[in-house]
Amino acid sequence: MEWSSESAAVRRHRGTAERREGEAAASHRQREASAQEDAKGVGRMWGKTENGGGSRVAKTALSEARTALALALYLLALRALVQLSLQRLVLSRTSGLQGEFDARQARDYLEHITAIGPRTTGSTENEILTVQYLLEQIKLIEAQSNSLHSISVDIQRPTGSFSIDFLGGFTSYYDNITNVVVKLEPRDGAESAILANCHFDSVANSPGASDDAVSCAVMLEVLRVMSASPEPMQHAVVFLFNGAEENVLQASHGFITQHPWASLIRAFINLEAAGVGGKELVFQTGPENPWLVQAYVSAAKHPFASVVAQEVFQSGIIPSDTDFRIYRDFGNIPGIDLAFIENGYIYHTKYDTADRILIDSIQRAGDNILAVLKHLATSDTLASSSEYRHGSMVFFDVLGLLVIAYPSRVGSIINYMVVMAVVLYLGKKLLRPKHRNANYMRDFLCGLGITFISWFTSLVTVLIIAVFISLIGQSLSWYNYFYIAVCLYGTATVAKIIFIHTLAKRFYYMNASDLYLGELFFDTSLFVHCAFLVALTYQGFCSAFMSAVWVVFPLLTKLCVYKDFKKHGAQGRFVALYLLGMFIPYLYGLYLIWAVFEMFTPILGRSGSEIPPDVVLASILAVCVMILSSYFITFIYLVNSTKKTILTLILVCAVTFLLVCSGAFFPYSSNPESPKPKRVFLQHVSRTFHNLEGSVVKRDSGIWINGFDYTGMSHVTPHIPEINDTIRAHCEEDAPLCGFPWYLPVHFLIRKNWYLPAPEVSPRNPAHFRLVSKEKMPWDSIKLTFEATGPSHMSFYVRTHKGSTLSQWSLGNGIPVTSRGGDYFVFYSHGLQASAWRFWIEVQVSEEQAEGMVTVAIAAHYLSGENKRSSQLDALKKKFPDWSFPSAWVSTYSLFVF
């Protein structure tokens, strides 16, 4: 018993000693592990518990729900600020004051012009009625003008030709078109002038209120105010009301290359439209001549300008062009290009009416144009502007309140200074012993890889969704409801980014602390934006300033909140300070993103049948999400979980996807307040094909139907069953441009079209085309001289045969320009009256062929008057649903072989 008792005591003593030794050993092992971990990466241990466990400290983890809600509310608040700035069209009202622009008077001009109706070049409405109205108003303005000024008026009717690298390239010829030119100058005259340009013509079947009658109305009112002003002018102001811009910039070419006043012009302001109302955006300046941007910055009362828009437009991804190109390329004159960009859904449609343009839109445009023209008319720089032709400008407005502008070379210096700051910031981290020894570089590089993987996989995901939706025939479901695109593609992108980073956090960085990872991924985002800054600056893009903004403010924010972040961890105070520091880049980012979608979304409804709009929009939206989420990635590593957020995003995306697939969202709208019509072009055409002997080998007639978006006629067929795939048009392989009367060379954009059989059309003014002469030239080429007569708009097509080349012609600069696909396209128009169009082409024949050397065709387009209509065309138009806009006219097509 005693032995047993003694043994028990010994055992208790030994057990206690063993426990103490075990605890000491465990403590020693823990310290060793901690030391080893420190050697591996002290930074990775931020926020660890005192016992060295691997779990994250609760106090450093942000609440998932609260963080997600805070970020969502933050972005919504910024979006609300952007919307507020866009709705505030004028900063101060001056309408009605003596010597100020009066929008009510300008609206009166606008309503009178649009009341005339569609104004196509060559029509009575354009060449007589509109011109008469303009001359009447100019005469009244002249009667009220101040004796300090002199007003001269000239009606120009130029004839000319040029080639243009637009829509794949083609040549333009015009005859007897109309320009109304007004010169306002000091009584003693002036040796230099500033040009203000608008166009009063419109596309067929549209009143053209925004494009471009409102600009002409603004110019009339500016002319009235300036001519009545008691303030002396140093230079002249030439107001050009051109009557053939919609004919691919013909009237501006006629003015700048032929008018005697053109030699006075030192700079210009071009007023255009790609939408209806809203703010007019400065989207092109120069080339070079930074003094022009400075003039706008100094004078404009309601600025709205962006060098980003300029570089996007000049990249060619927007299928449009303006008179700016003509003055720049053919006149070698610098200028400013402005355009209304809001509500492009009704641009070039019957809905482009005067009542849709707000009075404040007219007021702000008038205030700006008047102020800038006054500034330039008294500028010492204008007369010797060539001396100031150096470099380009970085310019951007801040919510329409002011414009910041500086030379691009200064911008490059600033950008590289910002890059150096980032290099110092990251270099300092790498030089810290704890980071050098902790494989910070490895974690950083892995973080970059994870970020790029998340972006790539998210882009692939939304593209798969977009392609699937396109294949099942549900494209453009977001066209009438843009939030559908956000709920479908935006949520998918965000969910995939969060998912990839959550996997990295759980399986790769499982032993790293939240705070360490939060800082690490801030650094990776900073580095990515810095890399973009370097690339854009090196390539000479002025829009690199945006990347600089997305580097400077986040870096300053990080430096300001770093101590608080280290001391207190990721808490509400940190989130508030962090979001406050990101205010400027995110606000301006959303501001630009709005502009991008305001321009591109309507364009995708008229971009042709070959470009899947969902793929384009999904890509743009995914890139925007990547940019906006870049500095929010850090929160993925600071929250306690992301499960609910991912599930919510997936749920929203899945529900939207199912609704889209079921056809719940119809793309188009006939809502009178905000119509978003489907564009369809109808041409009742009679075609005649001749062989080499001149005999007719084929003759047919029908209504040629082109849908200008990716959905084709799928939504129209239920309303008009006869328009179905059984009448799909077939390409005539041996004929230029597939044997159809293309108004412009957009055949590569619209390959899906329909040909509904219909009776032959017989216009009262039929087109005539004949070979005048065929001559063999001394240099072994064949010169073919042709003569054509017909309506105000015609198209001429040429295709050379094997062994033949088109060496020269009497059009443009004499050098034939091929269109996309290898054929030659000539756009012809004339004013109210014109003589026969005579021209020649010269064909070099290296090898004679039995089928001849060249095939030519001519199409006549009847865009105005009674000739534009046919009973079959009218009957078909009536069948189209009210959510569509069918633009219709009559055409003839004749093909010949020589």
Swiss-Prot record:
Bias (Basic and acidic residues) occurs at 29-41
User: Which cysteines are cross-linked by disulfides?
Assistant: C198-C216
UniProt EC number: 3.4.-.-
> Keyword set for this entry?
Acetylation, Disulfide bond, Endoplasmic reticulum, Glycoprotein, Hydrolase, Membrane, Metal-binding, Metalloprotease, Protease, Transmembrane, Transmembrane helix, Zinc
From the broadest rank down, the organism's phylogenetic lineage runs:
Eukaryota, Metazoa, Chordata, Craniata, Vertebrata
Name the gene for this chain: Ermp1
Residue sites binding Zn(2+) 1 per the record? H199, D211, E272
Q: Which residues are glycosylated?
A: N176, N724
Record site feature (Transition state stabilizer), residues = Y347
Query: What Gene Ontology terms describe where this protein resides (cellular component)?
Result: endoplasmic reticulum membrane
> Species name for this entry?
Mus musculus (Mouse)
Which GO terms fall under biological process for this protein? cellular response to oxidative stress; endoplasmic reticulum unfolded protein response; proteolysis
> What's its membrane topology?
Multi-pass membrane protein
Q: Where in the cell is it found?
A: Endoplasmic reticulum membrane
SUPFAM superfamilies in the record, alphabetically? Zn-dependent exopeptidases
Q: Which residues form the active site?
A: E245
Report the function annotation for this chain: Within the ovary, required for the organization of somatic cells and oocytes into discrete follicular structures.
The record's region (Disordered) falls at 1-55
Positions of transmembrane segments? 67-87, 394-414, 452-472, 481-501, 516-538, 543-562, 574-594, 616-636, 646-666
One Pfam family of this chain: ERMP1-TM
Spell out the protein name for this chain: Endoplasmic reticulum metallopeptidase 1
